[in-house]
Curated annotation (Swiss-Prot):
Compositional bias segments (type: Low complexity): 157-168
Name of the gene: ociad1
Protein's UniProt name: OCIA domain-containing protein 1
Organism: Xenopus tropicalis
Keywords: Endosome
PANTHER family: OCIA DOMAIN-CONTAINING PROTEIN 1, OVARIAN CARCINOMA IMMUNOREACTIVE ANTIGEN
Location in or out of the cell: Endosome
Amino acid sequence: MAPSPAEFSDQQQPAPHRTVQPPGVGYIPTDDERRVFRECNEESFWYRSLPISAVSMIVTQGLISRGILTTSSRFGSLPKVAFAGLCGYLAGKVSYMKTCQEKFKRLENSPLGEALRQGYRNIPTQYPSGTSEFSDVNPKTASPADGFASNVVEPPSSVYSSHHNSTSDTVPFSTSLGESSPSGISDNIAPEPAALLEDTPKRKPMTYDELRSRNRETYEMAVTQRADAPVRSSLDRAARKDVKTNKYGDVWEE
């Protein structure tokens, strides 16, 4: 018996996707999930934590024996070796986390596995791509020409010319030919006080002959001072020779 059109449409309709809420704090894992937890704990210890911890402890002990790392005076090399083993244990657990997640994602009828699969595969629909909450343009009414026209940048030359015209209109230039500056600017300039200009004494111009005679006088004065200096020094020396002094430099009077 051939299926009816209604039954055929029901068979062609895909099953609705079941969304699973992420497990909370009070989530109780299923038996399969507990089994995977135990497997992950054992495998991460034997396959990752133990080998990495052993290698770290051996390398640390080798560095201590060569003198690269110093030992404690009380406990010896035990603190550094134990710390290296702990770091290796934690590194092994962290490195096995990706493998454990893959095991949970392969589980069927597992809320935890379904949550992991949705987190890695689906994109949240509450953040649709291509729209912005700050955009005010309606996508149904906006056209490509409008968007292109709104993004056109005005050239610098036109901006400068429009700004220059606006500023030139606001400044009131005078219409007379004798004035080259705006009348509004020239009116604000304070005139210089005439009294100060009149009080300043005017220097009399000096001729070439006057300057020559002044230089000659200064030269003659310098020559006479130089000629008097040797005479004074010779007189002082003669006076010093006539005066008798003792061995201490004191003047000896007879």
